């Protein structure tokens, strides 16, 4: 069951997660095993259940998994959302031992599975494809570099550039897709650019 819990800028992450978990727990009391574990997916780098780096929002430096485990007495796992996506695809859809999954949203992430095992690389950075530098003197990125792929080919970057090209304050993904399907020249141009950047 999917349920949304909107977060506002400046919200206390730990308090919000505690509230969400407290809200969900009673729903599973009647089940034989109740809740056997909690997984938290984040946009960022995770190693050994510890958040190392998040480019788009600051996360507290405490051990989130341990804090929640000690309070709720349930195993808590923190993982990069692209890694979770490739695990989900492998487990529930394709059953492949070797696969790569691209996640494109505000950033660009990659989940990598080799011989049935998640591949994280050194310090968990293997899937951070969005921070491949396309243009060394390009747009600044929250990671601290300039010209990263996700500053040009992420959903966020495409919509911002399309809004600029079409003199709009903001464009939704639905509006962009509609314009592309209707062959609006600027939308076609943006998709051409996206295809070029993402295939480099």
Q: What annotation goes with each model-predicted range?
A:
Residues 97-152:
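Glycine-rich phosphate-binding loop of actin/hexokinase-like ATP-binding domains
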Residues 9-31, 149-152, 157-200:
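Adenine-nucleotide phosphate-binding core of ATP-dependent small-molecule kinases
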Residues 5, 52-56, 146, 178-179, ...:
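Conserved short-loop catalytic and cofactor-binding motifs
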């Amino acid at each position: 069951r999917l349920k949304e819990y909107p977060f506002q800028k400046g919200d206390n992450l730990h308090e919000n997660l505690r509230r969400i978990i407290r809200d969900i727990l009673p729903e599973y009391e009647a089940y034989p095993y109740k809740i056997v574990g909690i997984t938290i997916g984040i946009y960022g780098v995770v190693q050994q259940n510890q958040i190392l780096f998040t480019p788009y929002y600051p996360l507290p430096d405490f051990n989130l998994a341990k804090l929640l485990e000690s309070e709720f007495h349930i195993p808590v796992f923190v993982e990069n959302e692209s890694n979770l996506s490739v695990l989900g695809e492998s487990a529930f859809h394709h059953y492949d031992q070797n696969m790569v999954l691209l996640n494109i949203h505000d950033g660009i992430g990659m989940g990598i599975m080799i011989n049935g095992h998640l591949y994280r690389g050194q310090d968990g950075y293997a899937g951070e494809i969005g921070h491949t530098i396309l243009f060394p003197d390009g747009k600044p990125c929250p990671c601290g570099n300039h010209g990263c792929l996700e500053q040009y080919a992420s959903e966020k970057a495409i919509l911002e550039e399309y809004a600029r090209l079409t003199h709009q304050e903001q464009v939704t993904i639905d509006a962009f897709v509609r314009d592309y399907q209707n062959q609006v020249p600027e939308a076609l141009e943006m998709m051409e650019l996206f295809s070029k950047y993402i295939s480099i």
